[in-house]
């Protein structure tokens, strides 16, 4: 079993409850969109029972990382979701989603749709929760806006909700989206969650820092404000002095909010997946 350890401590909430995740399984698959081999890591909860329904936690890595970030990294943003999945008996999935410079372009989106379809074929999957930080936090919001009926909840940490105004990592985003903002403006609009707030009816937790210069927080602050005005289940954790990271306590609070809200939400039929 993979140990789950909080930063600054030797005993975790998950360990105290006797919860663990199984060994990571590195899964290769052929992407239907282009025939290339892609990968994701899957970890089943301790005592996994294939005969009953399980929720899924899909975690999306940051820029420059890969599918192993949320499996091996000892930062709070990565350790907390592992513990959450173990504690709640969730299937834990960490995809490459087109590698270190994804930004949830069309191929990454198609891969994630395919992964969710595969999980639903292989297991009795109930609800799917997305989480990520930085590029992963952006990607989680983007995918939820594009496929709201496939996502039951979102934890977005230090991401952006507006890829039209975002001016960092433009070479990577251009390659992922198939062109610049001037060449394919519809891709940047379509993948900016701020422009699709009406689709975001699921529980969402957003963390952001006022001094984050890597992924400035203004767009997620605006998105959270709109969601609050629409009486959506949203929790914003904003630290004026915070930078491009989220501490352990705020990460725990964000996941607690979403997991609890998802558990209380009425069931809905899963979307058909292609």
Model-derived features: where do they sit?
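Short beta-strand/loop motif that positions the catalytic acidic residue
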Residues: 200, 206-208, 212
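Alpha/beta-hydrolase active-site loop
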Residues: 103-122
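Primarily recognizes the serine-hydrolase "nucleophile elbow" in alpha/beta-hydrolase
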Residues: 118-121, 126-172
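Short substrate-entry loop that stabilizes the transition state in hydrolases
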Residues: 49-54, 60-104, 164
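A domain-start/cap signature at the N-terminus of enzymes
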Residues: 8-54, 186, 234, 255, ...
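Mobile cap/lid helix-loop segments that gate and shape the active-site cleft of serine hydrolases
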Residues: 69-76, 159-196, 202
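C-terminal catalytic histidine-bearing segment of alpha/beta-hydrolase fold enzymes
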Residues: 104, 214, 218-274
């Amino acid at each position: 079993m993979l140990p789950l350890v909080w930063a600054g401590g030797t005993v975790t909430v998950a360990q105290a409850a006797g919860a663990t995740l199984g060994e990571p399984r590195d899964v290769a698959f052929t992407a239907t969109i282009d025939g290339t081999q892609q990968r994701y890591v899957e970890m089943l909860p301790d005592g996994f029972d294939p005969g009953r329904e399980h929720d899924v936690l899909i975690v999306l890595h940051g820029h420059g990382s890969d599918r192993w970030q949320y499996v091996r990294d000892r930062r709070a943003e990565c350790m907390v979701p592992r513990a959450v999945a173990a504690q709640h008996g969730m299937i834990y999935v960490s995809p490459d989603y087109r590698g270190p410079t994804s930004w949830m372009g069309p191929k990454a989106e198609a891969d994630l749709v395919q992964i969710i379809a595969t999980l639903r074929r292989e297991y009795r999957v109930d609800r799917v929760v997305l989480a990520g930080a930085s590029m992963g936090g952006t990607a989680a919001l983007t995918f939820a806006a594009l496929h709201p009926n496939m996502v039951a909840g979102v934890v977005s940490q230090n991401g952006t909700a507006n890829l039209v105004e975002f001016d960092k990592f433009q070479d990577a985003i251009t390659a992922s989206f198939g062109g610049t903002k001037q060449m394919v403006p519809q891709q940047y609009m379509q993948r900016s969650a701020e422009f699709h707030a009406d689709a975001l009816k699921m529980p969402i937790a957003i963390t952001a820092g006022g001094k984050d210069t890597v992924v400035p927080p203004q767009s997620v602050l605006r998105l959270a404000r709109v969601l609050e005005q629409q009486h959506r289940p949203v929790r914003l954790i904003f630290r004026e002095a915070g930078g491009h990271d989220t501490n352990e306590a705020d990460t725990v609070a964000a996941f607690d909010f979403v997991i609890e809200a998802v558990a209380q939400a009425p069931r809905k039929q899963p979307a058909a997946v292609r």
